From Swiss-Prot:
It holds the Pfam family Ribosomal_L2_C. Keywords: Ribonucleoprotein, Ribosomal protein, RNA-binding, rRNA-binding. One of its GO terms (molecular function) is rRNA binding. Disulfide bonds: none annotated. One of its GO terms (biological process) is translation. Belongs to the universal ribosomal protein uL2 family. InterPro entries: NA-bd_OB-fold, Rib_uL2_dom2, Ribosomal_uL2, Ribosomal_uL2_bac/org-type, Ribosomal_uL2_C, Ribosomal_uL2_CS, Ribosomal_uL2_dom3, Ribosomal_uL2_RNA-bd_dom. Residues 21-59, 224-274 are annotated as: Disordered. This is Large ribosomal subunit protein uL2. The gene is rplB. Part of the 50S ribosomal subunit. Forms a bridge to the 30S subunit in the 70S ribosome. PANTHER family: LARGE RIBOSOMAL SUBUNIT PROTEIN UL2M, RIBOSOMAL PROTEIN L2. Residues 263-274 have a biased composition (Basic and acidic residues).
Length: 274
């Protein structure tokens, strides 16, 4: 889609760079595939904040996405749509055989009129879904299942992909964007291609209000807080914090390992990140 650079005609437009929406449909989303969505504001079922810096934002309708791709037969791409709930774009697929529509994550390069299919005999083309054992080594895939039939769990954000780098018995070796190499059952499904909107990471929101529209609240530095609120808080005048950087709960940050030891999935990780 490319990027849209704004001229500095107002203070808030100075330096603003957003993803261009040229080529995306301006129609309302498919009504049968949308539902209401209540914002949690970062709270859990007890009302306690479990994720900081969440709250507010524009109202959103949830788009029901087909992450399992169980439907066989050819589908026609009707349009490419913006989805406020994720960074990648969506493709509305129409199956003429039974007159059913569904949303899938649009891979890079997909356009209205393209044909997609799912099944073991599908061609190796962007948007087609196959079992990992039928996809050639070296291919880029997204929407990868972790367990057969559970639906896609890996490589779903804008510009994300995983690469098949080898096979090991009933498993496939998959290199993730983080550099981690992981074993995935070859009976899991994956979709060919890279998720659309790779320029999402290059955008510059330009003003605080645009963050608030997205439901992102301000992040306050610990050094600017009081001692009761943060380990870095307090002190006379401006201070350095007086200790190595920590979280509000006193856990060391900036490089500390956060993965739990002896996780059951350790045996499926052949190479760590980086």
């Amino acid at each position: 889609m490319g990027m849209k650079f704004f001229n500095p005609v107002t203070p808030s437009s100075r330096g603003t760079v957003l993803v261009s929406k040229v080529g995306l449909s301006k129609d309302e989303p498919e009504k049968s595939l949308t539902s209401g969505k209540k914002s949690s504001g970062g709270r859990n079922n007890h009302g306690r904040i479990t994720t900081r810096h969440r709250g507010g934002g524009h109202k959103k309708k949830y788009r029901v996405i087909d992450f399992k791709r169980n439907r066989s037969g050819q589908g026609i791409v009707e349009k490419i749509e913006y989805d406020p709930n994720r960074s990648g774009f969506l493709a509305l697929i129409s199956y003429k055989e039974d007159d059913i529509k569904s949303y899938i994550l649009a891979p890079q390069g997909m356009k209205p009129g393209d044909v997609v299919t799912a099944g073991n005999d599908a061609d190796i083309l962007p948007g087609n879904c196959l079992l990992l054992k039928h996809i050639p080594v070296g291919s880029f895939v997204h929407n990868v299942e972790l367990k057969p039939g559970n639906g896609a769990a890996i490589a779903r954000a804008a510009g994300c992909y995983a690469q098949i780098v080898g096979r090991d018995g009933q498993y496939v070796l998959l290199r993730l964007r983080s550099g981690q190499i992981r074993l995935i059952l070859s009976s899991c499904k994956a979709t060919i291609g890279v998720v659309s909107n790779p320029d999402h990471k290059n955008r510059k929101l330009g003003k605080a209000g645009r963050s608030r529209w997205l439901g992102i609240r301000p992040t306050v530095r610990g050094i600017a807080m009081n001692p009761v609120d943060h380990p870095h808080g307090g002190g006379e005048g401006k201070t350095s914090g007086g200790r190595h950087p920590v979280t509000p709960w006193g856990v060391a940050t900036k490089g500390k390992k956060t993965r739990r030891r002896n996780k059951s999935s350790d045996k499926y990780i052949k190479q760590l990140k980086g």
